[in-house]
Amino acid sequence: MEFDAVLLLSFGGPEGPDQVRPFLENVTRGRGVPPERLDAVAEHYMHFGGVSPINGINRALVTELRAEVGLPVYFGNRNWEPYVEDTVMAMRDNGVKRAAVFATSAWSGYSGCTQYVEDIARARRAAGPDAPELVKLRSYFDHPLFVEMFADAIAAAATTVPKDARLVFTAHSIPVAADRRCGPGLYSRQVAYAASLVAAAAGYDDYDLAWQSRSGPPQVPWLEPDVADHLETLRAGGVKAVIVCPIGFVADHIEVVWDLDSELRAQAQGAGIALARAATPNADRRFARLARGLIEELRSGGEPARVGGPDPVFGCLAGINGEPCRPPHCAARETAAQGA
């Protein structure tokens, strides 16, 4: 399978104070999120001048991708400019026939995969009958370079805290019902498996996994423990230093720079705990090499590059033109569950 372009598909983020509220309304449309919750989240962005770091990071990643893949690289978002619909129309107008889609999520499940599949289908509908073929690359939470980048980030963070620092992985929490939607704990099992691979690569036999950035009504069960609650448990157990690795994020979303770097760090300081936060991949050249490797797998038909571990959890295969993932992966399970 050959490609004549690459599309970097991401979440999007505001780039000025006047964009914050419209962006949040895009993100939460149809979910019944109360206005006061949007106001609270908007304040997080205002601490950074109303600018999310994600678009700047993605533009830097586009530069790295262009150098690695030797193809035109386009950039489109779900929730803010440049919108993926506009990007795909530009690709059509530029004569692109088939593009590899690299999404900034390593995971399966609705938020991690299916929503990006829906983005692809929606963008192709907007572009009409001459829309390019769009091939979403597979999940990559067990790719050797994904594991290497996070293991190296942990090693760098470890140099800034005492040697007995406790390693804590975090990922975005989701409702328990959502985690069961695509099979038994598909997303949470993938995160736990990736954490085990990264911990082993970084030389840690013992570590913790916690969840962050939950929202919604308190009566709705979400994945636990929450990282703030877990930090208190560690404090009560006498832990004096932690390394937090946000393995669920491939870039510095607001959930990383606010929820961890601001709120969790303040909690740690108040508890007398030294906290080091491991870097996310962001625009690391190896992240672009990872994408190139996923493209080469489709070009050559070769075996996927994966780090093996006990009790492996597999992710989504490549998907074409917004079609559901093939069994036994997430969108196929979702479709089957909805039709039952």
Curated annotation (Swiss-Prot):
GO molecular function, one term: metal ion binding
Pathway listed: Porphyrin-containing compound metabolism; protoheme biosynthesis
Class of this enzyme: lyase
Binding site for Fe-coproporphyrin III: 52, 116
Keyword Lyase belongs to the record: yes
GO biological process terms, semicolon-separated: heme biosynthetic process
Keywords carried by this UniProt record: Cytoplasm, Heme biosynthesis, Iron, Lyase, Metal-binding, Porphyrin biosynthesis
Reaction catalyzed: Fe-coproporphyrin III + 2 H(+) = coproporphyrin III + Fe(2+)
Localization of this protein: Cytoplasm
UniProt-listed Enzyme Commission number(s): 4.99.1.9
Residue positions binding Fe(2+): 172, 255
PROSITE patterns, per the entry: FERROCHELATASE (PS00534)
Function text: Involved in coproporphyrin-dependent heme b biosynthesis. Catalyzes the insertion of ferrous iron into coproporphyrin III to form Fe-coproporphyrin III.
Family (UniProt): Belongs to the ferrochelatase family.
Protein name per the record: Coproporphyrin III ferrochelatase
UniProt source species: Mycobacterium marinum (strain ATCC BAA-535 / M)
Designated gene of the protein: cpfC
